[in-house]
Amino acid sequence: LSLRRQRQMCIRDRNCIIHSGTVIGSDGLGFAKNGKKWEKIVHSGKVIIGDNVEIGAGCTIDKASSGATEICNGVKLDNQIHLAHNCHIGENTIIGANTSIAGSVRIGNNCMIGGLCGIVDNIQITDEVTIYPMTFVTNNVKNEGAYSGGPILMEHKDWLKKSVTLRKK
């Protein structure tokens, strides 16, 4: 893409620090099944980065399929974080290294997300939430507070049995 077109896709405000190796405005994982083939869905949106944002080295931030992927004022991203298309990261939120956030996730203001977390698509996390490291977020977080949890490595069949037990409690 031309430099002019890239600038249209990414709007950056004042006092931002973006470390080396970071890619901003890449296409998200947008494909539709057509018979036995996958066809690319055009991502025509953009990335908006607020004031006083710091983005660590080696991060990837996908542009929106339409609309915007938004990183609000005061956000701090550690190294090697992936933000998929159409995400919204609220003001003064900090996210630890190697966290992967799937498409259309909305994280509120003043949150802390520990390293090595995974957040599945379309999740909403309210303001003032702490997610401890290595937590896999699969449900909306509607109440402020601290959350943790991550499965211990075990055979999948055993994990399925244990997860059913946890859901019953």
Where are these regions (language model features)?
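Glycine-rich hexapeptide-repeat left-handed beta-helix
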Residues: 12-14, 18-49, 53-169
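Single conserved hydrophobic/aromatic residue that forms the stacking wall/gate
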Residues: 1-11, 85
